[in-house]
Regions:
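Glycine-rich FAD pyrophosphate-binding loop
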Residues: 9-13, 25-46
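Glycine-rich, N-terminal phosphate-binding loop of Rossmann-like dinucleotide-binding domains
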Residues: 13, 164-165, 294
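Predominantly flavin-linked oxidoreductase catalytic cores and closely associated redox partners
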Residues: 122-253
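A conserved beta-strand/loop capping segment in the N-terminal third of enzymes
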Residues: 58-115
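C-terminal helical "tail/cap" subdomain of flavin- and related membrane-associated enzymes
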Residues: 314-367
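N-terminal Rossmann-fold NAD(P) dinucleotide-binding loop
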Residues: 17
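Redox-cofactor binding/interface segments in oxidoreductases and associated redox assembly factors
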Residues: 11, 162-163, 286
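FAD/FMN-dependent oxidoreductases across multiple families
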Residues: 78, 154, 234-313, 321-323, ...
Length: 367
C-alpha cells in the first residue's frame, strides 16, 4: 500500500476544492487533492457572476479571468459577457435587468469543464499533489486522519476538507446530517434558436409546472433547462414531445427566440437545496456544494464555491496559527443560510398565477 502524508487532504477537485487547496498551499501547507475517477456529471455553460469574478481577481487569479474574457467557449468567437436577465415571472411581461447596473460588473457565460481545467492549471504549486481515487475508508488515530483510497493508498493528514459537491461524501462518512429542501430536478438540453441567437441575456420564465432557464453557450447554441418536481421531470424526460408544450405555454421564450431546434440528449440533475448545520469540526471543514448547494434560481453556485473555499482555508489557517478571525465561519454560514432561504422563499412567492399547482405549493412553503 502506498503511503502519503500531508497537512491537508482536500476531497474533491472542483472549483471549491482547488481554490481551498491553493490558498493553503500558498500559506506553506502541504496539500493532497483527491478527485473522483468515476465522476462524469455533464456540465453545461454556466454564468460566472461579476461578484465571483471579483473574488478571483482578489485571489490573484487575474490571468485566469483574462483567459476567460479573451477566448471563447467551444472554439467559437462570441462575446462571453452576460449583459443581464429577462424574467417572465409572475406575469407574461418581461422584467429586464441590465448587468451594467450590477456593482460587481458583467458576468461571463463559461464552459464549466473548460473553467475547471483552466483553474487546475493555475493552481499548480509544488506543495499540491493530485490523486484520482475513491475514498473507501476514513478513521482518526491520535489526532490524525487515516484516509484509505481504493484499498491501495493511505493518506495521513491533520485536516480533511469536504469539497465533494452535492454528494458530500466526507460529511456522510463522518455521520453529519444534512438538510434537504423541497424536491427539485433540472432537465438540461441544448438548442438552436430561430432568431436573436446573439442575445446575451439570461432568460428565466415560470409556468404551472416549474420554471425555464435559457442562456447562450456558443456562437450557435443555447442551453435550455427546466426545473420541476421529480415525477414531472420523469415524464418530460421520457416524452420529449412534451417540451413543446413547456416552451410554448406563454413562456416568452418562443417570442424572443422563435422555434427552437432541440437536441436529442437530455440531462437530469437533482438540484434541490441542501446544506449541513455543521460546517466544521475537529480536524475537518466543508465548503462548496458539500456545505451548501443552492437552488439554481439563486444563480450563486460558483460564487458560493469560491467564497466558502476561501473561508474554509482561513478556518484551517487560523487554527494552525492560533489566530482569531474577525468573522466566525459557522456564524457567517448560518447568516448566509438565513438570507438565502428568505430570498428564495420570497422569489417563489412572487408567482401567484398557479397557487393550486403541485410545484408552486411545494416551493412556496417556507421551511
Amino acid at each position: 500500500m502506498l503511503n502519503y502524508d500531508c497537512d491537508v487532504c482536500v476531497a474533491g477537485n472542483g472549483p471549491s476544492g482547488m481554490i481551498a487547496a491553493r490558498q493553503l498551499a500558498l500559506a506553506g501547507l502541504s496539500v493532497i487533492i483527491i478527485g473522483s475517477p468515476n465522476h462524469q456529471m455533464h456540465k453545461f455553460g454556466e454564468t460566472l457572476a461579476g461578484a465571483a469574478i471579483r473574488l478571483l481577481l482578489k485571489l490573484g487569479l487575474k490571468e485566469l479571468v483574462e483567459t476567460l474574457l479573451n477566448t471563447s467557449n467551444d472554439n467559437n468567437s462570441f462575446p462571453p459577457k452576460v449583459t443581464g436577465n429577462m424574467a417572465f415571472w409572475g406575469t407574461e411581461q418581461a422584467s429586464i435587468t441590465d448587468a451594467i447596473h450590477d456593482p460587481y460588473g458583467l458576468g461571463l457565460r463559461i464552459d464549466r469543464q473548460r473553467f475547471d481545467t483552466l483553474l487546475k492549471q493555475y493552481i499548480q504549486l509544488k506543495n499540491i499533489t493530485h490523486l484520482n481515487a475513491n475514498i473507501t475508508n476514513l478513521t482518526k488515530q491520535n489526532g490524525l486522519w487515516k484516509i484509505t483510497l481504493d484499498g491501495k493508498m493511505l493518506i495521513t493528514s491533520k485536516w480533511i476538507i469536504d469539497a465533494t459537491g452535492r454528494s458530500a461524501k466526507i460529511l456522510k462518512l463522518l455521520g453529519v446530517q444534512r438538510y434537504r429542501g423541497a424536491p427539485l430536478v433540472a432537465l438540461y438540453r441544448t438548442c438552436v434558436p430561430e432568431k436573436n441567437i446573439s442575445l446575451n441575456k439570461t432568460i428565466i420564465s415560470s409556468n404551472e409546472s416549474g420554471w425555464l432557464y435559457a442562456g447562450k453557450i456558443s456562437e450557435e447554441k443555447w442551453v435550455l433547462g427546466f426545473h420541476t418536481l421529480p415525477k414531472f421531470a420523469f415524464n418530460l424526460r421520457n416524452h420529449a414531445s412534451h417540451w413543446d408544450d413547456i416552451i410554448n405555454k406563454k413562456s416568452g421564450i418562443t417570442d424572443l427566440l422563435g422555434q427552437l431546434g432541440l437536441s436529442a440528449d437530455i440531462y437530469a440533475h437533482d438540484v434541490r437545496t441542501t446544506w449541513s448545520p455543521e460546517n466544521s469540526g475537529e480536524g475537518w471543514v466543508a465548503c462548496g456544494d458539500a456545505l451548501l448547494a443552492f437552488d439554481p434560481i439563486a444563480g450563486q453556485g460558483l460564487f458560493n464555491a469560491i467564497y466558502t473555499a476561501i473561508k474554509a482555508s482561513e478556518h484551517i489557517l487560523s487554527a494552525e496559527q492560533k489566530i482569531t478571525l474577525e468573522s466566525n465561519y459557522l456564524k457567517e454560514f448560518q447568516k448566509i443560510i438565513k438570507v438565502y432561504e428568505h430570498r428564495r422563499y420570497s422569489l417563489y412567492k412572487e408567482e401567484q398565477r398557479w397557487l393550486d399547482s403541485a410545484f408552486w405549493k411545494v416551493h412556496q412553503y417556507y421551511q
